[in-house]
Amino acid sequence: MARYLGPKLKLSRREGTDLFLKSGVRAIDSKCKIDTAPGQHGARKPRLSDYGSQLREKQKVRRIYGILERQFRNYYKEANRLKGNTGENLLVLLEGRLDNVVYRMGFAATRAEARQLVSHKAIVVNGRVVNIPSFQVSVDDVVAVREKSKKQARIKASLELAEQREKPTWLEVDAAKMEGVFKRVPERSDLSADINEHLIVELYSK
């Protein structure tokens, strides 16, 4: 399945919640009709079956993190192999992706922009260039903007926006140096309460 390149707000309307695919610090406002489905008249959303709810939750999380279906299934398999709660393991793996960490540290306004920075070799991990968005960041890894990329206006603008967002407690960021440390693995309480990972586990457990 190809990566979706259409209007970002349409995806948020389809899921009925802000997926934070657009830059900025404010949630999508009421003019965007987040509670109505995409389309000229915003068709009424049908009541979903259990399977439909599970599928919709998986699609929502997949879109939040910008993951293709095959990648997402592989993350689930890995989460299921690990000790502990499979759903929480899944979210931790997604949060540990380099593109997500770059976004969380404020070097990019969206995860899509973070993926682009990583792919364009603008990010270093422990002093070495890493251009793989799915690279798993480990505790105590230092993630930084590459020296020759620090003058990019979009990175500076993103850091200014990040000052207005809630800062993740599992990361330590030095905005002036454009670098940060992955201090610890995030706990479930650190992450979005709007995600019901149990539905995803139920879907893949069938």
UniProtKB/Swiss-Prot annotation:
Described purpose of this protein according to its UniProt entry: One of the primary rRNA binding proteins, it binds directly to 16S rRNA where it nucleates assembly of the body of the 30S subunit.
Subunit details: Part of the 30S ribosomal subunit. Contacts protein S5. The interaction surface between S4 and S5 is involved in control of translational fidelity.
Entry annotated with the keyword Disulfide bond: no
PANTHER family from the UniProt entry: 30S 40S RIBOSOMAL PROTEIN, SMALL RIBOSOMAL SUBUNIT PROTEIN US4M
Cited CDD domains: S4 (cd00165)
SUPFAM superfamilies given in the database record: Alpha-L RNA-binding motif (SSF55174)
Cross-referenced SMART domains: Ribosomal_S4, S4
Record-stated family: Belongs to the universal ribosomal protein uS4 family.
GO MF entry, a single one: structural constituent of ribosome
Transmembrane spans: none
Keyword Kinase: no
Name the record gives this protein: Small ribosomal subunit protein uS4
Span of domain S4 RNA-binding: 96-156
Any single GO BP term: translation
Domain of life: Bacteria
Keywords: Ribonucleoprotein, Ribosomal protein, RNA-binding, rRNA-binding
Cellular component terms per the entry's GO annotation: small ribosomal subunit
